Amino acid sequence: MPEGPEIRRAADNLEAAIKGKPLTDVWFAFAQLKPYESQLTGQLVTRIETRGKALLTHFSNGLTLYSHNQLYGVWRVIDTGEIPQTTRILRVRLQTADKTILLYSASDIEMLTAEQLTTHPFLQRVGPDVLDARLTPEEVKVRLLSPRFRNRQFSGLLLDQAFLAGLGNYLRVEILWQVGLTGQHKAKDLNEAQLNALSHALLDIPRLSYTTRGQSDENKHHGALFRFKVFHRDGEACERCGGIIEKTTLSSRPFYWCPHCQK
């Protein structure tokens, strides 16, 4: 499943295609959304927001389309009039004069008013988004030490969207390697230096992944761009200590780590 950085980049692509342009045609697959087709035609997409792995498409008439891709949903951008060759099931089509965005295969789709947006169960449950520039390491540290989370093993905590939205398995693996901790650690057992390092890594690594993953580092500045240090690298040497990276399963997900330097 895509994690926060991938969802945010997808939202950026959708925004670039249709933000601020009048919608010339709107189509929904689900019967409960059909009444909104005429209401949205002629409106503008004003913003596409991410809350962890959910997308909120905001319209100029005050409505918001909530969608969660879950395992199989995917958005696509096409030229208006193009007919994509795919076996996926179309759920949403938002069309402008030149570009159209399509949502395939997702099933968790709702239209929300401004009031419903504040009471939606998933949005109420989800924690602060790691890509929200307003979120600080100090606030993350307070969250780590809160009664709700301080006694949770990191193996499960770093997958829990109620703790921090946008984290997922590869980020869990890379964050814990960065700070030299294992999945069995808990916040209550860390010293001040470890807590500070983890609080920063929980924001720095997702943000680095969002801004630079997939880009080439032409100047060869080590560490300037995101790349996997341990994820999917079992059997290779750890670049920090030379130990051999191992693979196991934690919280029902593959987990990669270096037993030599993650203590």
UniProtKB/Swiss-Prot annotation:
The record describes how the cofactor is bound as: Binds 1 zinc ion per subunit.
Gene for this chain: nei
Tell me the protein's name: Endonuclease 8
| Its EC number(s) | 3.2.2.-, 4.2.99.18
Q: Which cofactor does it need?
A: Zn(2+)
Reaction(s) this enzyme catalyzes, per UniProt: 2'-deoxyribonucleotide-(2'-deoxyribose 5'-phosphate)-2'-deoxyribonucleotide-DNA = a 3'-end 2'-deoxyribonucleotide-(2,3-dehydro-2,3-deoxyribose 5'-phosphate)-DNA + a 5'-end 5'-phospho-2'-deoxyribonucleoside-DNA + H(+)
Zn finger spans (FPG-type):
229-263
Binding locations of DNA: Q70, R125, N169
Q: Where is the active site?
A: P2 (schiff-base intermediate with dna), E3 (proton donor), K53 (proton donor), R253 (proton donor)
Write out the entry's keywords from A to Z. DNA damage, DNA repair, DNA-binding, Glycosidase, Hydrolase, Lyase, Metal-binding, Multifunctional enzyme, Zinc, Zinc-finger
Q: Which PANTHER family match?
A: ENDONUCLEASE 8
Q: Name one GO biological process term.
A: base-excision repair
Please name one Pfam family that this protein belongs to: H2TH
Q: Superkingdom of the source?
A: Bacteria
Per the record's keyword annotation, is Transport included, yes or no?
A: no
